Swiss-Prot record:
NCBIfam families assigned: PBP_1a_fam
Localisation: Cell inner membrane
Transpeptidase as annotated region, ranges: 398-711
Family: In the N-terminal section; belongs to the glycosyltransferase 51 family.
Gene responsible for this protein: mrcA
Origin superkingdom: Bacteria
Function: Cell wall formation. Synthesis of cross-linked peptidoglycan from the lipid intermediates. The enzyme has a penicillin-insensitive transglycosylase N-terminal domain (formation of linear glycan strands) and a penicillin-sensitive transpeptidase C-terminal domain (cross-linking of the peptide subunits).
Protein name, entry field: Penicillin-binding protein 1A
Keyword Phosphoprotein found: no
Keyword Nucleotide-binding: no
Lineage of source species: Bacteria, Pseudomonadati, Pseudomonadota, Alphaproteobacteria, Rickettsiales
Periplasmic side: 28-790
GO molecular function annotation: penicillin binding; peptidoglycan glycosyltransferase activity; serine-type D-Ala-D-Ala carboxypeptidase activity
Annotated region described as Transglycosylase, given as residue ranges: 49-220
Length: 790
C-alpha cells in the first residue's frame, strides 16, 4: 500500500515537473517575439480636435477616432466600479490573468451551453488592454497565450490605475465614441464627473457589443444589460440595495448636445482646418492631436449671416420665376411614390409635396408624412408674372418644393444661383462670420476664399483713392461724357459707357463715386495714371498681378470676396494694414498654448461690458503698417458714406447708422457685390452663378446683394450705437455745394480737405465770393440737418 502511494506520488511529481517544463518552454517560446509593452508608458492616444467659436460654442470636431483623453484621477469611482463589476470582478487581486475566473467561466459555460444561454468570457481588463494595444483580434491559441504572458508582465510593471486609464481611454463605445469621455458626451451630453450610477452602468455595458447595444433600436436588451451591471455592482458591494433599485428603475434617456452649446459654421470650420494644418505642417497632428482651437467666430453673427445669405439668394431666384416641377408622379399611391423620389440637394428646411388637386385660386398638396394642405395662389404669385389661374402653372401629380408658413405652405424652389458673405472686425482682422455658399453639404467650394470673380464697380474706390493720395481734391470737377481711350497700335480704341448709357455732364469727383459713374472713373484714372492704380490694387491685396489695362479700373481684374472685404477693412480702420484671420488660440491635449495669434497686451481687458460696443480698440503705433495715409483714407471713407446717403447704396440709409459702402456689378451682370462698413465691422457679400452667366439685364449690386447686407445689419447691428469715423488732424471739414463743388457756407455737403490744401483753395475759383471769414473753420451744429459729416 505504501509503495503504491509512493509510486503515485512520484508520477504526480513527475507530471507536475513535465507540466512546469512545458509551461516554461511555452513561455520561453512565445516570449521571444512579444511586442514592446513599454510603449504603453508613453500613451498618447489619437484624440479629437475641437473647434470653438470665440464665445465657447462647439463648431466642429475632427478626428480619425473621436476620443478625449481623461486621466484616471478625473474618472469618478462609480464609473470605475461599473467597469470592474461588468468586466473584471477580481481586477485588483489577480496578476493580469484571472485563473479562478477562467475555471468559473468554464464550468458556467457548460451550463450555459446546455441551456442555450450566452457564453461567459474570462478575459480580464488587462488582457483587453493587451489585445487593444499590442495584439490583433485574431482568434487563435497562440494569440491567447501571448495575451496571457503580456498581461502578467504588464501587471508587474504598471499599477492598476495605469492599466485602467489605458482601458477607459482606448475602448470603443459605439456611435464613433472612443474612451469614456466621448461616450459620456455622445450618449448623455455630460462629462464623466456628472454621470449617475445608471448612466455609468450603461456605458460599462457597451464594450461587449457597442454596435448592437442601441437603446433606440433595442431598448429592452440594452436595459437588461445595464441592469445586469447594476446588479453586479450591488452584489460586489459597490452600491446599496436602494441605490441599485433606483438605478434600475430609471429609464435610459439619451441626450444630444444642446443646440445653444453649438454653432453651425461648416465653411468657417473647413477654413480653420486648412489654416491650422498649414500652420502645423501636419494633417496627422490636426486629426489625432486632441487640439482645442478657439476661433474669431461670433456665433450669433454667423447664424445671421447664413440666414441673410440664404434669404437673399432665394429672393433673387424667385424674381427669376418658377422653372418647373421636380417630377410628375401617379396619384394612385402618391405617398409611396413621393417617398421613392431622391431628396433634392440643398432642400434644407423645405419639403417635397405632390399636387393632388388644382383649382383656379389654390392647389391641394400632399406631403411625405401623408398629411394634406391647401396652398393659395397668393403664395405662388412670384412664379410667373400676371398669371391669374393656378391651372396654368401646375397640374395633378406635379412634385414641387414647399415651405411651411403660418398660414400653411408656400411654393418655393432651390436656388441655382450661389453666393457668399464675410464679416470682419476692421481693427483686428478677426473674421466674425464667413459663409461660403448656400449649402455646404451640396458644395464645399468656399466662395469667400476660393472663388475668383470680377469685382466690377467695387474696384472704383481704389481709383479714386489713388487720385486723393496724389493730391486731387475731392471737389474736383470731371466731365461725365463720352471718352475714347487709345490702346496702342493695332488695337481698337476703348469706348467705355455708363451703366444706363446716360451722361450727367460736369460733376464732382465725389459724385462720380457716389453714383458709380464709369466715365468719371475712367477720366480720374487717366489723370492719375495706370501705374499708380496698379500699385494701390497690389498694396491693398486685391490682386497681386493686375493687368495694366484701362478696363481694370472698372473691375475687370479677378479677386476673391475675402481679399476685397479685407481691402475695405483697411479703409474702415483708417488705412492701417490688417489681414483676415480665423484662428485665435490653439491648445494641445494637455492645455498648453501652442499658438496665440497676438501676444500683445489685451487692449479690451480694462473695458467694461457696457462700454465695449463704443470702444474702438486701436492698434499700438509700434505695430502699425500704413497702407495709405490717414487723410486720403478719411476722404475716401467720406465718399463711401456719401454713396449710402445719396448714391447706389441708398437703400442702406434706412438702417439709421453711419455706414460706408460700395456696390459692384461686373460686365453683363455676371457678378454682383456689396461691401459695407462702420468703424467696427465690415461686411462683404457676393452673388453669382458658379459657372458665370448673366444674372439678368437689370441685376446689380444694389438690387441683388445690397438687400443681403441690409438684412444682416438690421439684425446683427440694430442695437449697436452709430459710431462716427474719426476725423484725423490732417483733415479740414469745409462746406461745399454738391452740384458745383464750390466752397460755400450754405453748401449741402461737408467735404473733407487735406489741411495742406486749404491755403491753395483760397487762390482757386472754387469759392463763392461771400463775406464769411469762417468759411474754412466750419463746425456743424447738431441742429443742422441739411449738412452731412463723416
Amino acid at each position: 500500500m505504501y509503495k503504491s502511494l509512493l509510486f503515485c506520488l512520484k508520477i504526480f511529481v513527475f507530471l507536475i515537473l513535465v507540466g512546469c517544463g512545458i509551461t516554461a518552454y511555452i513561455i520561453y517560446h512565445y516570449s521571444r517575439d512579444l511586442p514592446d509593452y513599454s510603449q504603453l508608458a508613453r500613451y498618447y492616444p489619437p484624440s479629437v480636435t475641437r473647434i470653438y467659436s470665440r464665445d465657447g460654442k462647439l463648431m466642429e470636431e475632427y478626428a480619425f477616432e473621436r476620443r478625449v483623453f481623461v486621466p484616471i484621477n478625473s474618472v469618478p469611482s462609480s464609473l470605475i466600479e461599473s467597469f470592474i463589476a461588468a468586466e473584471d470582478k477580481n481586477f485588483y487581486n489577480h496578476p493580469g490573468v484571472d485563473l479562478f475566473g477562467i475555471v468559473r467561466a468554464a464550468f458556467l459555460n457548460i451550463s450555459n451551453y446546455l441551456h442555450h444561454r450566452r457564453m461567459e468570457g474570462a478575459s480580464t481588463i488587462t488582457q483587453q488592454v493587451v489585445k487593444n494595444f499590442l495584439l490583433t483580434n485574431e482568434v487563435s491559441l497562440e494569440r491567447k497565450i501571448k495575451e496571457a504572458i503580456l498581461s502578467y508582465m504588464i501587471s508587474r510593471v504598471f499599477t492598476k490605475d495605469q492599466i485602467l486609464e489605458l482601458y477607459l481611454n482606448q475602448t470603443f463605445f459605439g456611435r464613433g465614441a472612443y474612451g469614456v469621455a466621448v461616450a459620456a458626451q455622445n450618449y448623455f451630453n455630460k462629462s464623466v464627473e456628472e454621470l449617475t450610477i445608471a448612466e455609468s452602468a450603461f456605458i460599462a455595458a457597451l464594450p461587449k457589443a457597442p454596435s448592437e447595444l442601441n437603446p433606440e433600436r433595442n431598448y429592452a436588451r440594452v436595459k437588461a444589460r445595464r441592469d445586469y451591471v447594476i446588479t453586479r455592482m450591488f452584489e460586489d458591494g459597490y452600491i446599496t440595495r436602494d441605490a441599485a433599485k433606483e438605478a434600475m428603475d430609471s429609464p435610459i434617456v439619451l441626450r444630444k448636445r444642446a443646440k445653444e452649446e453649438t454653432v453651425t459654421a461648416d465653411y468657417y470650420a473647413a477654413q480653420v482646418r486648412e489654416e491650422v494644418i498649414r500652420m502645423l505642417n501636419s494633417k496627422e497632428v490636426f486629426y489625432t492631436g486632441g487640439l482645442t482651437i478657439i476661433t474669431s467666430l461670433d456665433a450669433k453673427m454667423q447664424q445671421l449671416a447664413e440666414n441673410s445669405l440664404r434669404k437673399g439668394l432665394r429672393e433673387f431666384d424667385r424674381r427669376c420665376g418658377f422653372r418647373k416641377p421636380i417630377a410628375n408622379i401617379s396619384l394612385d399611391n402618391w405617398q409611396g411614390e413621393l417617398k421613392k423620389l431622391p431628396t433634392p440637394p440643398s432642400l434644407l428646411e423645405y419639403k417635397l409635396a405632390v399636387v393632388l388637386d388644382v383649382a383656379d385660386n389654390h392647389v391641394e398638396i400632399g406631403l411625405i408624412d401623408g398629411s394634406k394642405s391647401k396652398m393659395p395662389i397668393a403664395e405662388m404669385k412670384w412664379a410667373r408674372s400676371n398669371f391669374k389661374s393656378v391651372k396654368t402653372l401646375l397640374k395633378k401629380g406635379d412634385v414641387i418644393v414647399v415651405e411651411a408658413i403660418k398660414e400653411g405652405y408656400a411654393l418655393r424652389q432651390i436656388p441655382e444661383v450661389n453666393g457668399a458673405i464675410m464679416v470682419m472686425n476692421p481693427n483686428t482682422g478677426q473674421v466674425l462670420a464667413s459663409v461660403g455658399g448656400y449649402d455646404f453639404s451640396t458644395s464645399k467650394f468656399d466662395r469667400v476664399t476660393q472663388a475668383l470673380r470680377q469685382p466690377g464697380s467695387l474696384s472704383k474706390t481704389f481709383v479714386y483713392l489713388a487720385a486723393l493720395e496724389n493730391g486731387v481734391k475731392p471737389n474736383q470737377i470731371f466731365n461725365d461724357g463720352p471718352i475714347e481711350i487709345s490702346q496702342g497700335p493695332g488695337m481698337p480704341s476703348w469706348r467705355p459707357k455708363n451703366y444706363e448709357g446716360k451722361f450727367l455732364g460736369e460733376i464732382t469727383m465725389r459724385t462720380g463715386l457716389e453714383k458709380s459713374r464709369n466715365l468719371i472713373t475712367v477720366r480720374v484714372a487717366t489723370a492719375v495714371g495706370l501705374t499708380k492704380i496698379v500699385d494701390i490694387i497690389k498694396r491693398f491685396g486685391i490682386n497681386n498681378e493686375p493687368k495694366k489695362v484701362y478696363s481694370m479700373v472698372l473691375g475687370s481684374i479677378e479677386t476673391t470676396l475675402s481679399r476685397m472685404t479685407n481691402a475695405y477693412a483697411i479703409i474702415a480702420n483708417g488705412g492701417k494694414k490688417v489681414e483676415p484671420h480665423f484662428v485665435e488660440l490653439i491648445k494641445d491635449r494637455n492645455g498648453k498654448i501652442i499658438y496665440r495669434r497676438d501676444d500683445r497686451e489685451c487692449l479690451a481687458c480694462n473695458v467694461s461690458d457696457s462700454n465695449l460696443d463704443t470702444a474702438i480698440l486701436e492698434i499700438p503705433k509700434e505695430y502699425i503698417y500704413r497702407v495709405t495715409d490717414e487723410a486720403s483714407d478719411y476722404q475716401i471713407t467720406s465718399f463711401l458714406t456719401g454713396a449710402i446717403d445719396r448714391g447706389t447704396g441708398y437703400a442702406a440709409k434706412k438702417l439709421g447708422k453711419i455706414i460706408g459702402g460700395k456696390t459692384g456689378t461686373s460686365n453683363d451682370s455676371k457678378d454682383t457685390w456689396f461691401v459695407g462698413f462702420t468703424p467696427k465691422i465690415v461686411v462683404g457679400s457676393y452673388v453669382g452663378y458658379d459657372t458665370p452667366k448673366e444674372l439678368g439685364k437689370r441685376a446689380t449690386g444694389s438690387n441683388v446683394v445690397l438687400p443681403i447686407f441690409i438684412d444682416f445689419m438690421s439684425n446683427a447691428y440694430k442695437d449697436k450705437p452709430s459710431l462716427p469715423f474719426k476725423v484725423p488732424d490732417s483733415i479740414k471739414l469745409i462746406a461745399v455745394d454738391s452740384a458745383t463743388g464750390k466752397i460755400t457756407p450754405g453748401g449741402t455737403v461737408i467735404e473733407a480737405f487735406k489741411v495742406n490744401n486749404v491755403q491753395m483753395l483760397e487762390n482757386e475759383d472754387m469759392i463763392d465770393n461771400q463775406d464769411n471769414n469762417d468759411i474754412f473753420d466750419y463746425v456743424p451744429s447738431k441742429e443742422d440737418q441739411s449738412q452731412e459729416i463723416y
